[in-house]
Amino acid sequence: MRLIIVSGFSGSGKSIALDTLEDCGYYCIDNLPAPLIEPFLQQAIASRSSAFDKIAIGIDARNQSANLTGFPDILGRARQLGVDCRILFLQAEPETLLKRFSETRRKHPLTDASVPLAEAIELERHLLEPVLSRADLHIDTTYTTIHQLRELVRQRVGIPSGGLMSLCLQSFGFKHGVPMDTDFVFDARCLPNPHWTASLRPKTGKDPEVVAFLAESADVHDYLNHLTAFLERWIPCFLAENRSYLNVSIGCTGGQHRSVYLVEALAGRLNSDRYNLLVRHRELPEPAEESHGTK
């Protein structure tokens, strides 16, 4: 039996994660009081029903504070039953959560007449710390769309698209923070920066003028060759380990030019029938993720 406990901050996408798992054949329960996890699992095991082979349970700040404080013991007892337990935790920057609640006009579960939204978000972070500190699967949804989140959930829990490993190439800007959900981070800030050419500043690494600017640099050429060689050498090893996903992030200062160019160039070089290739440009406007499929 496999159990995925889905937790995270309100507004971070927990409902979407549970819906995705349900679509993938998981028996899903949202907002189950934490002390009921163990008796539910005992009953599921006793039933010997294949319907309970894969279970997903949503646990969040709607649980009583005492239940969340005792979560580590509850998790330990669940594992003593022989259940393969994983914790998937979704989070986002406070500013993003504030914006999402403002746009949807939904009520945060911890707000009331005396607790404003910003304070409720901070309180929730404190309440969920016992769950967050034990999570082994993390997704930061600050910059993700619903489509991207669904794919990330499938990656994290081991349901790759089409039965293949998902390889995600992601560009980002260091000034906006390093992605939390990545396996490799490469720093491209040492390369020539199109930002300092006035005519290129408003463009991105997808535009022909920026592509031409970077393509004629020997340093960019060498960087790309070495990065390609590294990934071509080690991707087969990850495939041999039956990994369901591999996330590679390339960053420059703002995530507009160099990192975008490198990700696009890598995608053209690495396309393979051995994995499902996804491209994501975190700092660019939508559409921000593309499936390059196989060839």
UniProtKB/Swiss-Prot annotation:
InterPro entries: P-loop_NTPase, RapZ-like, RapZ-like_N, RapZ_C. Signal peptide: none annotated. Gene3D superfamilies: P-loop containing nucleotide triphosphate hydrolases (3.40.50.300). The keyword Cell membrane does not apply. ATP binds at residues 8-15. Keywords: ATP-binding, GTP-binding, Nucleotide-binding. GTP binds at residues 60-63. SUPFAM superfamilies: P-loop containing nucleoside triphosphate hydrolases (SSF52540). One of its GO terms (molecular function) is ATP binding. Belongs to the RapZ-like family. Displays ATPase and GTPase activities. This is Nucleotide-binding protein MCA0739. The lineage of its organism: Bacteria, Pseudomonadati, Pseudomonadota, Gammaproteobacteria, Methylococcales.
